[in-house]
């Protein structure tokens, strides 16, 4: 009795496992043009090199839930005195699942006065958005936000 | 119809931090969309934006297809003297537009 129960469970797990594999394959085929986490980390490495990226100082303002991924307002601000000795050199914004990992690079200087940039971006899917700031002492700081998108950008047909 | 909209305060006090808002009308075609017949719509985006004040660069941005159509950018600068802001957008297919705005500093 106990032996037959064990077999049944194993069979069930086997079937469930194959179903999961079968389920995963079409997802990969449907979205060939999606940036992978490897592309994201490569894009980040491209900017920061071997430097350590720490969490903090950066504030990424983006709605947690957006209806239309074609235009998502986004503001990045960095806590910095913006003096000649201590300022933000640049702000870089990345995403996880758009066809390309980059969103934009913004270059500031000490005379910006306030390290804050706003724009409107496109998001192809619900995903994480990461902002990285490079300070004048060449340290990197980051912030990440999760965004849920109900209508994705990039997927509709052009007329 | 002007293709650029710029918002810069006309007057400011010396040392003020002012906000600059810019909007350029552009389709920002990503290059990832297809027509009904399956052809890829070629990429056509603005790739670079620069703002100069009296000739010196104060802000620059590299744009990617993930920037929404009609790129809208806001940023800040400290004003020390009266002068002219010059804005430049450069993109695919030889796209190049400029705009300018003046500010009086008291």
Regions found by a protein language model. Give the residues of each.
Chain B
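Extracellular Ig-like/FN3 beta-sandwich strand-entry sites
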Residues: 17, 80-84
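Contiguous segments within soluble domain cores/interaction surfaces
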Residues: 5-10, 14-63, 68
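Short, aromatic- and glycine-rich surface loops/edge beta-strands on solvent-exposed regions
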Residues: 83-91
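Proline/serine/threonine-rich low-complexity linkers at boundaries of modular beta-sandwich domains
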Residues: 1-2
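Short acidic/polar inter-strand loop motif in beta-rich domains
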Residues: 91-99
């Amino acid at each position: 009795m106990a032996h037959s129960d064990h077999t049944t469970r194993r069979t069930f797990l086997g079937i469930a496992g194959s179903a999961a594999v079968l389920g995963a394959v079409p997802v990969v085929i449907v979205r060939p043009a999606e940036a992978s986490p490897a592309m994201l980390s490569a894009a980040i490495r491209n900017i920061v090199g071997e430097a350590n990226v720490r969490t903090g100082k950066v504030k990424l303002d983006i709605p947690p839930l957006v209806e239309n991924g074609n235009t998502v307002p986004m503001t990045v601000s960095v806590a910095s005195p913006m003096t000649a000795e201590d300022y933000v050199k640049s702000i870089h914004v990345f995403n996880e699942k758009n066809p390309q990992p980059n969103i934009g690079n913004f270059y500031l200087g000490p005379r910006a006065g306030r390290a804050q940039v706003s724009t409107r971006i496109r998001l192809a899917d619900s995903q994480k958005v990461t902002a990285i700031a490079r300070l004048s002492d060449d340290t990197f700081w980051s912030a990440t936000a999760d965004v849920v998108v109900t209508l994705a950008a990039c997927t509709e047909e052009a007329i | 119809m002007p293709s650029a909209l710029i918002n810069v305060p006309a007057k400011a006090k010396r040392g003020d931090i002012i906000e600059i808002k810019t909007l350029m009308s552009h389709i920002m075609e990503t290059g990832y969309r297809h027509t009904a017949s399956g052809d890829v719509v070629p990429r056509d985006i603005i790739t670079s934006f620069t703002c100069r004040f009296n000739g010196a660069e104060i802000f620059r941005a590299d744009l990617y297809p993930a920037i929404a159509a009609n790129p809208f950018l806001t940023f800040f600068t400290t004003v020390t003297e009266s002068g002219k802001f010059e804005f430049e957008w450069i993109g695919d297919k030889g796209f190049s537009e400029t705009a300018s705005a003046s500010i009086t500093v008291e």
